[in-house]
Regions:
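Active-site-adjacent beta->alpha loops and helix N-cap segments on the catalytic face
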Residues: 3, 75, 101-106, 122-129
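N-terminal amphipathic alpha-helix/helix-capping segment at the start of soluble metabolic enzymes
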Residues: 1-21, 79
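N-terminal low-complexity or amphipathic/hydrophobic leaders
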Residues: 26-60
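Catalytic cores of alpha/beta
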Residues: 30-33, 101-113
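Active-site-proximal loop/turn and secondary-structure-junction residues that shape catalytic pockets
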Residues: 27-29, 51-53, 97-103, 121-125
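Alpha-helix-loop-beta-strand connector modules within alpha/beta enzyme cores
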Residues: 65-91, 129
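Hydrophobic faces of well-ordered beta-strands that scaffold small-molecule active sites
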Residues: 20-24, 45-49, 93-99, 117-119
């Protein structure tokens, strides 16, 4: 099944009254494992990547100093891998950017293949957040 947006998965939780976990993954093997466990329970899987993980997956060893280009490359790399797993899976799989640091990081994730993003404005002044 192709990657799906987050909204339908969350709508189902409201409609049927259940909780849905979301799991941060920092490596392709972790993504594969999360999907495999969700398949066992026949439950949708929400995989989350963060800016730092995207920089790391983009080849940046000192990922805390990752550039936007590192994040773009990493978002593409993780999305391509997760898409392959999702296409072979009978369950819905969401790829979500968790705590995007800024607008550009969110755009990089969307362009890379993420199906959901969250921008973290907690470092901004209250009025801007």
């Amino acid at each position: 099944m192709p990657l799906v947006p987050l909204r339908p998965v969350l709508d189902a939780t409201v409609k049927y009254g259940y909780a849905q976990g979301a799991f941060n993954v920092n490596a392709v093997a972790q993504a594969e494992a999360v999907i495999a466990v969700h398949e066992m329970f026949r439950s949708p899987a929400i995989l989350q990547g963060a800016d730092l993980a995207n920089a790391f997956m983009g080849g940046r060893v000192d990922f805390a100093n990752g550039t936007l280009e590192d994040k773009k490359k990493g978002a593409r790399n993780i999305a391509e891998a997760v898409k392959k797993f999702a296409e072979q899976s009978p369950i819905p799989v969401v790829l979500h950017l968790d705590h995007g640091k800024n607008f550009d990081s969110c755009v990089a994730a969307i362009e890379g293949g993420y199906t959901s993003v969250m921008i973290d404005g907690s470092s901004l002044p209250f009025e801007e957040n």
